[in-house]
């Protein structure tokens, strides 16, 4: 019994001696250059929407006004562009086998307005049929949908992927 008390006391002592890491951003004044550097690091990896970048910076820094000022400057310097982000995102998701409905929904979640999203989603609207056919081919291979059950299964899959009925009616 005494041995278990000793182990318990030792564990308690170890926990109390380990200090919690302090949030360095709250204890030190944040400089706009630090926020800009962090934003540039994120933008160097891939394009971001303003909303995405803002969310990521707010996780690191607590100064709302400074973050917004830095974001405004990045837009003015053409380093942050909703248009470039939208174009890259549509291309990326289309190559991954997703349709226009799902991509539009994801863009809305990332703060992109519908007008800008529609511009890139409907640039090559005839390509969506080919994308739907490729997604179907990848998932189901050359299996022809002979019975109704298989047709419905393929239909549900393509709808889930964000394709519209008229994009895939003739390929099922």
Q: Predicted segment positions?
A:
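An alpha-helical, amphipathic repeat domain used for nucleic-acid recognition
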Residues: 1-172
């Amino acid at each position: 019994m005494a041995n278990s008390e000793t182990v318990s006391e030792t564990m308690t002592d170890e926990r109390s001696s380990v200090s919690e890491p302090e949030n360095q951003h709250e204890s030190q004044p944040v400089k706009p250059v630090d926020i800009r550097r962090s934003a540039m690091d994120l933008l160097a990896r891939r394009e971001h929407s303003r909303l995405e970048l803002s969310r990521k910076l707010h996780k690191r820094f607590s100064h709302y006004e400074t973050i917004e000022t830095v974001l405004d400057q990045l837009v003015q310097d053409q380093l942050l562009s909703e248009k470039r982000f939208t174009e890259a995102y549509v291309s990326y998701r289309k190559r991954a086998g997703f349709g226009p409905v799902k991509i539009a929904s994801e863009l809305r979640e990332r703060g992109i307005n519908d007008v800008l999203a529609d511009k890139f989603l409907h640039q090559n609207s005839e390509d969506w049929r080919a994308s739907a056919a490729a997604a179907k081919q990848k998932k189901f291979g050359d299996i022809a949908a002979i019975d109704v059950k298989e047709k419905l299964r393929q239909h549900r899959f393509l709808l889930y992927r964000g394709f519209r009925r008229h994009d895939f009616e003739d390929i099922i």
